[in-house]
């Protein structure tokens, strides 16, 4: 069976990379030069936030005669590089990058080939054929903080996502700004870093419980974190919402089915998918690219359910305090 010497293979791939060559797997696209494929990159398909985006994006794509090529990076740079090569091999017409913080430098291969891109909360100077969906985190978080203040909560904790993510930092900053707007004293001890998982929510809430004065309300950077907080509350026999008010973020599908139903901040996955697809389609159809790119705004809204209640007592002193 014929084989290629490893040294020769390495030299060939080096030349391929230097020339920027990627094989066309679409059979020359039947003379049209168009693949009618959009790429979709998400962070973690196991996170309940993302399947809804994938589903809606694909539904809209089918309606417009497009296919999608989807990949998940799990916040891994090497997986992102592999994903980009795969997308280029398939001659995608555009890519929606729904990673909420992946380094844009890794996407330079797509930019230099004038492949239309759409990001969420992108930073940096505007560029042609690069659209940005800016999330208005402040709107929904402000509503949630004002709601808790109206319920007489004065010690409101905030559990962030991984602060390596721009979106997590933006949500934390929105929380701080919202507390300042209503004149609430900010206690930095009440801001804990999480990792957007139930386990991370449990661990962060355990640290809050160890404080001399516990919070009476917890606002979480996503719903999965809030679910972890509620589970830890159950284990510690802290009743939600009687003893602790909890608010999530994202409004994932099953947030209304947990007990008690979770009050949360809605960031519509369906609308995010719709905006992302429309941004790519607009760029594909546009003969002259917008030199400054295009920005779209996605608003957030507070959704009231049953996980918050009036604070009938002062902040509880921790039984674990020394």
Regions found by a protein language model. Give the residues of each.
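Short, solvent-exposed amphipathic alpha-helices that sit
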Residues: 11, 48-63, 140-147, 166-185, ...
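Central regulatory/effector-binding core of bacterial HTH transcription factors
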Residues: 59-108, 116
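Hydrophobic alpha-helical segments within soluble ligand-binding/sensing domains
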Residues: 133-158, 173, 177, 198-207, ...
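Flexible loop/hinge segments that line or gate small-molecule binding clefts
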Residues: 75, 98-143, 164, 184, ...
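An alpha-beta-alpha
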Residues: 144-182, 189, 292-307
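Interdomain hinge and pocket-entrance segments immediately C-terminal to HTH DNA-binding domains
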Residues: 23, 32-46, 60, 64-66
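N-terminal helix-turn-helix DNA-binding module of bacterial transcription factors
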Residues: 1-36, 321-322
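Flexible loop/turn connectors
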Residues: 205-321
């Amino acid at each position: 069976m014929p084989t290629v010497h490893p040294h020769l293979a390495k030299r060939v791939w080096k030349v391929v990379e230097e020339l920027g060559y990627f094989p066309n797997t679409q059979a020359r696209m039947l003379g049209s030069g168009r693949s009618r494929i959009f790429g979709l990159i998400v962070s973690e398909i196991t996170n309940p936030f993302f399947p809804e985006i994938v589903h809606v994006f694909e539904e809209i794509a089918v309606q417009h005669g497009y296919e999608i090529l989807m990949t998940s990076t799990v916040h891994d740079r090497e997986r992102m590089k592999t994903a980009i090569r795969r997308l280029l091999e398939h001659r995608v017409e555009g890519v929606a990058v729904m990673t909420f913080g992946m380094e844009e430098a890794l996407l330079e291969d797509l930019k230099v080939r004038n492949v239309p891109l759409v990001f969420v909360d992108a930073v940096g100077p505007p560029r042609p054929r690069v659209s940005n969906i800016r999330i208005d985190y402040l709107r929904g978080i402000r509503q949630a903080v004002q709601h808790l203040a109206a319920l007489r909560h004065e010690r409101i904790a905030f559990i962030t996502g991984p602060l390596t993510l721009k979106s997590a930092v933006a949500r934390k900053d929105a929380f701080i700004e919202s507390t300042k707007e209503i004149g609430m004293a900010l206690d930095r001890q009440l801001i804990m870093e999480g990792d957007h998982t139930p386990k991370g929510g449990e661990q962060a809430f355990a640290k809050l419980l160890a404080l001399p004065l516990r919070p009476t309300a917890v606002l979480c950077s996503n719903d999965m974190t809030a679910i972890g907080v509620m589970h830890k509350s159950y284990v510690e026999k802290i009743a939600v919402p009687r003893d602790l008010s909890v608010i999530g973020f994202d409004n994932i599908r099953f947030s209304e089915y947990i007990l008690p139903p979770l009050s949360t901040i809605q960031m519509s996955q369906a609308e995010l998918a719709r905006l992302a697809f429309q941004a790519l389609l607009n760029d594909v159809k546009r003969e002259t690219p917008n030199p400054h790119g295009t920005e779209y705004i996605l608003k957030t809204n507070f959704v009231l359910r049953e996980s918050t209640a009036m604070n009938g007592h002062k902040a509880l002193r921790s039984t674990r305090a020394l």
